[in-house]
Design a protein with these regions (language model features):
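N-terminal beta-alpha lobe that positions the nucleotide/phosphoryl donor
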Residues: 1-172
Length: 172
């Protein structure tokens, strides 16, 4: 059983995890930036470590520091939402260094980061998915063909991002 969790996140996301930990009698570790030093999640955690004097949120993306603190404190790492939660390399580093990563394994994170692969995995698992393609479309004509099959509106998406909602074939 996990006895201590470092939350590699901030604000309300960290607080939700910390509250759950308290109910489950699990010790908590916060990481924070200089700007967040007075934040509720920092005060609420049983231990707190400053990872940067930078005001930027990118400080929460410093895997070396977060791993070092997790090892020092003997904590598992909960990435929360965003930041490191979708970083397969970070999850893999945790695995390699013997630190428990609370979340999907690195291979799953990597696969779910590729939209067409994610759709395939979800379909095979019997999960409901919105109509679309499981292979990348090649050009506007193929997009129009898919749109005709599934109906408008559609969301046109690259593998790593999403483009605006398309209401009809004229806006393609």
């Amino acid at each position: 059983m996990i006895k201590k969790i470092l939350v590699a996140n901030r604000g309300e996301i960290a607080m939700r995890i910390f509250r759950t930990c308290r109910v489950m009698d699990i010790s908590t570790v916060a990481v924070y930036t200089h700007v967040d030093r007075g934040a509720l999640h920092v005060r609420y955690a049983e231990e707190a470590y400053c990872i940067s004097n930078s005001p930027e949120d990118t400080s929460y993306l410093k895997p070396e520091l977060i791993l070092a603190i997790a090892k020092k404190t003997g904590a598992a790492i909960h990435p929360g939402y965003g930041f490191l939660s979708e970083n397969a390399d970070f999850a893999r580093r945790c695995e390699e260094e013997g630190v428990i990563f609370i979340g999907p394994g690195a291979d799953i994170i990597a696969k779910m980061g590729i939209k067409t692969e994610a759709r395939k995995i979800m379909r095979e698992a019997g999960l409901p998915i919105v109509p679309g393609t499981e292979t990348p479309v090649q050009g506007i004509e193929e997009v129009k063909k898919v749109a005709k099959e599934v109906g408008y509106p559609i969301m046109v998406s690259s593998i790593n991002s999403i483009y605006p909602l398309v209401s009809d074939s004229r806006t393609l």
